[in-house]
Amino acid sequence: MTIKLINIGFGNIVSANRIISIVSPESAPIKRIMQEARDRNMLIDATYGRRTRAVIVTDSDHVILSAVQPETVAQRLHTKEDGVEDA
């Protein structure tokens, strides 16, 4: 099993194999997930103080906040799965 890494913005890298979902932070259930993760010390803020645009949920119950759009993260994940490198 190879480890696939994906850039989630500002030089932050996440293991693509561990990602369960990539969602927008706007809905109340996602905000609740973010708050619960913060309370459990399982929240990773990778936004560098910028607005949260994507919430990444991993199989280890970590919740990662990213400042890039969910579509961008998903596209990077898709290109990594196809074996095509980012330009």
From Swiss-Prot:
InterPro entries: RemA-like. It holds the Pfam family RemA-like. It comes from the Bacteria. Belongs to the RemA family. This is Putative regulatory protein ABC2323. The lineage of its organism: Bacteria, Bacillati, Bacillota, Bacilli, Bacillales.
